[in-house]
């Protein structure tokens, strides 16, 4: 989701997430504010390591009382590893932490990123009649599937249906 094509070189580059609503104008239709936080410099998910997991956990803890849920945009290379690590590091969580991404850059006409992000946000704020989070755990949402963070593996590097939770789906 976080990559756009450089029109001069054709290379994929990260973009400023404060510009996210420019690429997904439908985000304006939500009746609540959407705040963003971006690591500087942005990180390629293939370089993800435990120190970054600790940083994500710290950000969630520092902002826990401000939000109903959290959505983490993540590259697909190591998304399943990050989701699993966060699920154990955030033990006792009572709010959704939804990881999502895309197989195609956000500015591509048929990108899967828009649907993945929009649905992830909806899941992150979903509440039941008792005003409790519907999904109070770390999950991955990808291509119409919501999967437990610590039970998901990447099965395909090219297809939209890139992840699976074979043994313990939601």
Set out the residue ranges of the language-model regions:
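Active-site histidine-anchored catalytic micro-motif
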Residues: 1-170
């Amino acid at each position: 989701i976080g990559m756009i094509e450089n029109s001069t070189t054709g290379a994929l580059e990260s973009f400023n997430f404060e510009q996210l609503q420019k690429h997904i104008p439908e985000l304006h239709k939500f009746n609540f504010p959407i705040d963003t936080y971006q690591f500087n410099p942005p990180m390629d998910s293939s370089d993800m390591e435990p120190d970054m997991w600790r940083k994500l956990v710290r950000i969630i803890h520092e902002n826990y009382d401000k939000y109903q849920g959290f959505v983490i945009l993540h590259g697909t290379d190591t998304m399943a590893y990050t989701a699993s690590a966060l699920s154990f590091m955030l033990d006792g969580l009572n709010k959704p932490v939804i990881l999502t991404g895309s197989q195609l850059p956000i500015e591509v006409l048929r990108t899967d990123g828009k649907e993945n992000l929009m649905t992830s946000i909806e899941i992150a704020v979903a509440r039941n009649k008792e005003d409790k989070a519907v999904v109070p755990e770390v999950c991955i949402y990808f291509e119409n599937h919501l999967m437990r963070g610590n039970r998901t593996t990447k099965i395909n590097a090219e297809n939209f249906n890139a992840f699976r939770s074979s043994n313990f789906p939601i």
